[in-house]
Amino acid sequence: MGTEIYGSIEFRHPGVGTDYYEGEPWVAAMDLWPLYDQSDYAAFGLLFGVRNYAGFQPLAAGRGLPNDLSGAVRAQLESSVARGDMDGATWVTWAQLAGLDPAFLPGRYVGRVSWSQPESGLSHGQLVPARWPDDVLATTGPPPPGWDPAHGPLDWTADNGLRCRYEPMRTDVLLGPGTGWPHVFAVMKALADRFGDDAVRLVVAFD
């Protein structure tokens, strides 16, 4: 069974510390779903250190749930995390996400190669270093001429008919168009434009 992500976007209420505001400091703005509904372990590893097979230095791993969690997100996550039904609980601010280097690559692997049979659509994949392992080369053949491990994605058809795809493990690919993360980031940025980069955060846990 695969690992899935759950969570919500919160913002810090601008009235905290004033005489007129008596509510909780952090307010739930929007659930992670329907903005993000995928299970990309490379992205999970990059951001949160979960299923980090690529060996990223994660941005925000193992922080736990914030002590000042909003009531709505507390009801969503706290009991499941406490029972052990979810783990990897952590949080990250928009300021930290906005500071990610889009061209960053992990040290061990530079990309991932996937392949599928046209008739079945069933896909297989493997993380690869700059020099592809022999078993990958035997399946997909060599990468096309002019291949650059830092660029892509790249699609080709192998001599055996397999449809192949290479994706670099760059931040802008793992979190870019088609991944679902741009929707999350768009909401967080809109909130940050109003409340400040450090006053918007994403709180998550995994099952």
Model-derived segments and spans:
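Acidic (Asp/Glu-rich) sequence patches and key acidic residues
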Residues: M1-D197, D207
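Conserved GNAT acetyl-CoA-binding A-motif
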Residues: A199-L202
